[in-house]
UniProtKB/Swiss-Prot annotation:
Organism encoding this protein: Staphylococcus aureus (strain N315)
Cofactor: Mg(2+); Mn(2+); Co(2+)
Keyword Iron-sulfur: no
Effect recorded for residue 108 to A: Loss of activity
Residues annotated as binding Mg(2+) 1: 90, 106, 110
Family named by the database record: Belongs to the Ntdp family.
Official protein name in the record: Nucleoside triphosphate/diphosphate phosphatase
Keyword Hydrolase: yes
Note on how the cofactor is bound: Activity is highest with Mn(2+), followed by Co(2+) and Mg(2+), but the enzyme probably uses Mg(2+) under physiological conditions. Has low activity with Ca(2+). Cannot use Cu(2+) or Zn(2+) ions.
Domain of life of the source: Bacteria
């Protein structure tokens, strides 16, 4: 990753999700950077405009903290709802950043984590379909399945973005930055 492309704290950036075939999948119009390093980007957003590949748009319903890592094949969205914190985890390529946006390839598989800690692997049918349509290499399949296991371990061990302190720290940081 180019040093100049690492987003800085307080900066607002776009997030662009692509599919394996290089086509845009989804764009979040604005996320405020809370931490940006070579390996980790943490951001926050609330009521953010999201544009789908077909041009449809919608607005996120609640504040969220997003977590991206340059070495893991997943990213995590921590959503703050009235009944607790939900996590939506995308199996994806590690992120890259350039002047335009933070970017990653979405590989269909998702894990949804509920406030009680239970979780479900989602979209396995979509993954199989796209793996065949877009010819995901066998190596990618192995990497993604290994990262599903890593992600499940993190969830069960309350590690990384699933740690209670992670939520407290970054939610507070996001509130402070938004006040300025």
């Amino acid at each position: 990753m180019v040093r100049e492309s690492i987003p800085k704290e307080g900066e607002n950036i776009k997030i662009q999700s692509y599919k394996h075939d290089g086509k845009i999948h989804r764009v979040w119009s604005e996320t405020t950077i809370l931490k940006g390093t070579d390996h980790v980007v943490i951001g926050g957003n609330d009521h953010t405009l999201v544009t789908e590949s077909d041009g449809r748009t919608w607005i996120t319903r609640e504040p969220a903290i997003v977590y991206f890592h340059s070495e893991y094949w997943f990213n995590v969205i921590c959503m703050f709802r009235e009944d607790g914190i939900y996590y939506y985890c995308n199996l994806s390529s590690p992120f890259v950043c350039d002047e335009e946006a933070l970017k990653y390839i979405d590989y269909d598989l998702d894990i949804k984590v509920y406030p009680n800690g239970k979780y479900h692997l989602l979209d396995e049918d979509e993954y199989e379909q796209h793996m065949n349509q877009m010819n995901y290499p066998h190596d990618i399949d192995i990497i993604l399945r290994r990262n599903v296991d890593i992600l499940q371990q993190w969830i069960e061990q309350k590690k990384g973005p699933f740690a209670p302190d992670f939520i407290k720290v970054w939610k507070e940081r996001y509130k402070k930055i938004r006040q300025y």
